[in-house]
């Protein structure tokens, strides 16, 4: 069950960002699928789901609880070395956050698909 209408303006904005990364496929044939568009980059095909959010996500695992159904649906797409599954979220302040969906975890990434650096604990 969905909560509200599809975020068409957010999807359009996401496609503009994605076009800087590669070629975007957005066809009526994709309507009703588990993703909003497909992004073709050098060596990788990215399936992207776009969502709106009311707050900043401080922990990638929040995506799993906020968008449980979307995460489950996008995980149906096989994850391989050349296929990526991502959820992009837009806040009311027009800031984007990007998350790569693995089978066992969710990782925050940058707009270019690279992982956000995590803080390292320095011993002692």
What do the PLM-derived regions correspond to, one by one?
Residues 18, 37-39, 43-59:
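Conserved catalytic cores of phosphodiester-cleaving nucleases, focusing on short active-site segments
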Residues 20-34, 38-42:
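Active-site metal-binding core of divalent-cation-utilizing nuclease and nuclease-like domains
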Residues 31, 53, 91-93:
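Short, solvent-exposed coil/turn elements at secondary-structure transition points
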């Amino acid at each position: 069950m969905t909560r509200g209408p599809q975020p068409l303006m957010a999807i359009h904005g996401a496609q503009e960002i994605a076009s800087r990364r590669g070629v975007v496929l957005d066809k009526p044939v994709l309507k009703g699928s588990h993703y909003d568009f497909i992004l073709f980059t050098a060596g990788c095909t990215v399936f992207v789901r776009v969502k709106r959010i009311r707050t900043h996500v401080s922990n990638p695992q929040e995506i799993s609880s906020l968008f449980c159904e979307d995460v489950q649906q996008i995980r149906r797409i096989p994850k391989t070395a050349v296929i990526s599954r991502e959820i992009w979220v837009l806040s009311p302040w027009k800031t984007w956050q990007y998350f790569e969906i693995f089978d066992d975890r969710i990782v925050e990434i940058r707009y270019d698909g690279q992982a956000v650096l995590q803080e390292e604990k320095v011993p002692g």
